């Protein structure tokens, strides 16, 4: 649908956020509402946001929605969603009925990647790999400012691939993948998500820190935090080396809570060449530009080609 204004929706586990952009990507309004953690409440909350933005713009706006899961092209059924009440539901169809318009739906990691590719940290690069490091560990691929979904719609979704070149300690880990849909051994998410990182630290040192507190300890020169962040950086370099070997992006852009750790952008690039079949790696490792707004902006940009 053609519209001068674009609405982006970020469907989170406890809150649903919306943004209204003009045709140049300027933010006109942004709102966030809590909702009851069930299917109907989620649809009602999205409708509330869309109705409010339509009123502000005085137009029937295009709507893009980022979800923590995947929507089948064949059936429209949601799978592998962390918000479990979405699974096995025809969410796109039901949302279109509620909003009385076509809706574009995409995985939230892809929305983040698209946002940074269109007018974020990756706007000057042709090929982008975007990574979200937060509660989970997801990824997305973009080429020429368009998302590459792949035949199975999981291109770049590397969170549940096995950690490459595992050390003996990693092979002996007793921490399971935090995702409800996984359970595989050596799953990358159990090592790389914010939850996985702090769980490994706390189990090893018999502590009860959050990931943010561990990062603060590192800034205070705590040797435990420095060691564990160093191990984390090495794991990230191994994973990035695999992606570089397959997709060879111009830039890798980090998002999510752990993307705010400044040392990553110095240390990880220097480690990647150890694991690539190349003496020099030109791929840039960058921090996102849009911060917490990136995913919801990317959802709005799902209508960028219209």
What is each of the regions a protein language model found here?
Residues 1-62, 71-75, 93-103, 116-125, ...:
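ATP-binding/phosphotransfer module of carbohydrate and carboxylate kinases, centering on a glycine-rich
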Residues 76-87:
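A charged helix-plus-loop insertion that forms the helical arch/lid used to bind
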Residues 67, 74, 143-144:
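A cytosolic small-molecule/anion-sensing beta-strand core signal
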Residues 30-32, 81, 150:
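Residue-level detector of high-confidence beta-strand sites
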Residues 105-109:
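Short loop/edge segments at beta-strand edges and connector loops
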Residues 34-37, 86, 154-157:
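A short acidic/small-residue loop/turn micro-motif
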Residues 125-187:
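Glycine-rich phosphate-binding loop of actin/hexokinase-like ATP-binding domains
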């Amino acid at each position: 649908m053609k519209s001068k204004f674009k609405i982006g929706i970020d469907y989170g586990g406890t809150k649903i956020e919306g943004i209204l952009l003009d045709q140049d990507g300027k933010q006109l309004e942004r709102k966030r509402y809590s909702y009851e953690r069930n299917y109907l409440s989620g649809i009602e909350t999205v409708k509330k946001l869309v109705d409010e933005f339509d009123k502000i713009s005085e137009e029937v706006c295009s709507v893009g929605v980022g979800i923590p899961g995947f929507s089948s092209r064949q059936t429209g059924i949601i799978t592998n969603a962390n918000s479990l009440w979405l699974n096995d539901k025809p969410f796109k169809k039901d949302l279109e009925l509620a909003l009385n318009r076509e809706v574009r739906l995409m995985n939230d990691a892809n929305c983040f990647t698209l946002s940074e590719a269109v007018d974020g940290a990756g706007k000057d690069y042709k090929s982008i790999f975007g990574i979200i490091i937060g509660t989970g560990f997801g990824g997305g691929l973009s080429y020429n400012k368009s998302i590459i979904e792949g035949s199975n719609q999981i291109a770049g979704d590397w969170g549940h691939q096995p950690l490459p070149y595992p050390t003996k300690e990693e092979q002996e880990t007793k921490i399971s993948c935090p995702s409800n849909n996984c359970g595989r051994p050596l799953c990358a998410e159990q090592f790389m998500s914010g939850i996985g990182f702090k769980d490994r630290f706390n189990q090893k040192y018999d502590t009860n820190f959050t990931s943010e507190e561990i990062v603060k300890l590192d800034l205070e020169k705590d040797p435990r935090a420095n060691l564990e962040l160093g191990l984390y950086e090495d794991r990230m370099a191994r994973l990035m080396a695999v992606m570089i070997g397959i997709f060879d992006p111009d830039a890798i852009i980090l998002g999510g809570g752990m993307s705010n750790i400044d040392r990553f952008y110095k240390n990880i690039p220097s480690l990647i060449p150890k694991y690539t079949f190349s003496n020099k790696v030109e791929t840039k490792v960058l921090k996102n530009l849009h911060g917490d707004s990136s995913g919801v902006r990317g959802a709005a940009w799902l209508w960028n080609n219209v």
